[in-house]
Amino acid sequence: MTPPASAPRVITVVGPTAAGKSDLGVFLAQRLGGEVINADSMQLYRGMDIGTAKLTLPEREGVPHRLLDIWDVTETASVAEYQRLARREIDRLLAEGRTPILVGGSGLYVKGAIDALEFPGTDPEVRARLEAELAERGSGVLHERLAAADPDAARSILASNGRRIVRALEVIEITGKPFTANLPGDEPVYDAVQIGVDVERPELDERIARRVDRMWDAGLVDEVRALEAAGLREGLTASRALGYQQILAVLAGECTEDDARAETVRATKRFARRQDSWFRRDARVVWLGGGHRDRGELPHRALTLVERAVTA
């Protein structure tokens, strides 16, 4: 399904963590008279500020940022709910003649917003049974079952990610189809200009390490401690966020703070690689250099790309 030529434009700024997406989103919104719509699943949570690198109010430079701080840390993330909220914001901006700019590295959230993606329903009885089995037998056993039922899904879901494994098995049982059959293709709902920010791996790894250091120095441990008191540990999604999961382990006496800091760096580097792989599978994403040699030119190259697409 291809939108008609007159379909309004949506811009996405995607790529791995620490690539420089947020600043580029602010620049484009200022130049195009638009607003930023958050597409980072963990920035949806209230109070998760330091560890998600959420822009402060001064850093937003007056640009409205939508879909930040909308969920409590005890709530489980829902791509279907995000899709509803994001499309509402997109449609509002388009109706006002303004430019929606989705910014974030949560690939499924971006696709859910701009592509034709329908979510299978849920069955509380099936979900409860699978979650009980997860608690009793562990994610490894369920991952083996998923591998037998849908090898492609098993390859794309970490064996340690019990929540996603349970969801995949639930969908298979409800629909009678492989979980991957329900994953999004590239059928657009909106005519989108998709910009990927590309940073070479050695430089990106250095940025990630420095960012984690800044987060610790800015008080991430205290932020997690306060969120723990607000129910973070019980949140199935928020408690797994990078940095937060590791510090919760410190607060539980399971590791040292130095160990948690080092593991946060390692886990974030692995996560950045998975993000990069996800977005590179989408041929519609145009990649622009965001490394130190290109950083000064990135905003103007992105603006030129958008302007050419709009006038094409």
Curated annotation (Swiss-Prot):
The record marks 106, 127 as: Interaction with substrate tRNA. It catalyses: adenosine(37) in tRNA + dimethylallyl diphosphate = N(6)-dimethylallyladenosine(37) in tRNA + diphosphate. Its EC number is 2.5.1.75. Its cofactor is Mg(2+). The keyword ATP-binding applies. Residues 40-43 are annotated as: Interaction with substrate tRNA. Belongs to the IPP transferase family. Monomer. This is tRNA dimethylallyltransferase. The gene is miaA.
